[in-house]
């Protein structure tokens, strides 16, 4: 069972690799669901990690209805990821009706020629996931990341099971959202998904002297709480599938 860990900083990338992760999804700002990471993070992760790295291609948070400028931005980001040596990219685009935007996806996949392509959880907003799955297969996507159109992958386990049965090995189904050591084994037993995706997040407190009168952005966020990958969660999940 391959385990993909999504990360948004170099500390987490190293923890994930050293804890047994099989692949990294390199993102910016996981608190927003993940956006395109900076050039410097992509390059540094690729320089110091020796497991496959897929780069998130998402120009902003919010919906997956992109304008012409954003499409060009995504194409450029894919070219950068390719030039830096990434093994794959993570994409997704929908129409106003909640269908896979075939035109945009064709452009992005063409830009990614030679790289692996994962379609991200925009899939969980599809109006018809079963038709959408066939479209992703036709597009040539390597895998789709999905929670089975539910809040968590465990809640969507029976939809995931149906998607796996429909896919018949033509595309990998990777379950993500709320995956943890307490539900991973049961999730896989029921759904038979090919891979698991998780952030395995924890946090450490900053050692920097603070100023409680100032916040840097969202007031609900603690600027002195540093989110990182929890090695114990990864080790525990890997162990589940080795027994």
UniProtKB/Swiss-Prot annotation:
It comes from Histophilus somni (strain 2336) (Haemophilus somnus). PANTHER family: COPPER HOMEOSTASIS PROTEIN CUTC, COPPER HOMEOSTASIS PROTEIN CUTC HOMOLOG. This is PF03932 family protein CutC. GO terms for cellular component: cytoplasm. It comes from the Bacteria. Keywords: Cytoplasm. Belongs to the CutC family. Gene3D superfamilies: Copper homeostasis (CutC) domain (3.20.20.380). It is found in: Cytoplasm. Its main location: cytoplasm. GO terms for molecular function: copper ion binding.
């Amino acid at each position: 069972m391959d385990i993909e860990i999504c990360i948004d900083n170099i500390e987490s990338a190293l923890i994930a690799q050293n804890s047994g992760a099989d692949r990294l999804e390199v993102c910016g700002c996981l608190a927003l669901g993940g956006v395109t990471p900076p050039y410097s993070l992509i390059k540094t992760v690729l320089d110091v990690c020796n497991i496959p790295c897929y780069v998130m291609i998402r120009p902003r948070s919010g919906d997956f209805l992109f304008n012409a400028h954003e499409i060009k931005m995504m194409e450029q980001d894919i070219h950068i990821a390719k030039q830096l040596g990434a093994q794959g990219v993570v994409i997704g685009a929908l129409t106003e009706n909640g269908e896979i935007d075939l035109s945009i996806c064709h452009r992005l996949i063409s830009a990614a020629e030679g790289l692996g392509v994962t379609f991200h959880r925009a899939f969980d907003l599809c109006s018809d996931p079963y038709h959408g799955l066939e479209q992703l297969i036709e597009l040539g996507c390597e895998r789709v990341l999905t929670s089975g159109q539910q809040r968590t992958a465990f809640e969507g386990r029976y939809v995931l099971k149906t998607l796996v049965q429909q896919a018949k090995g033509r595309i990998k189904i990777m379950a993500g959202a709320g995956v943890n050591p307490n539900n991973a084994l049961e999730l896989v037993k029921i759904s038979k998904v090919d891979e698991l995706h998780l952030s395995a997040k924890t946090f450490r407190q900053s050692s920097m002297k603070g100023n409680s009168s100032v916040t840097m952005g969202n007031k609900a966020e603690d600027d002195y709480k540093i989110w990182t990958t929890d090695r114990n969660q990864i080790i525990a999940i890997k162990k589940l599938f080795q027994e």
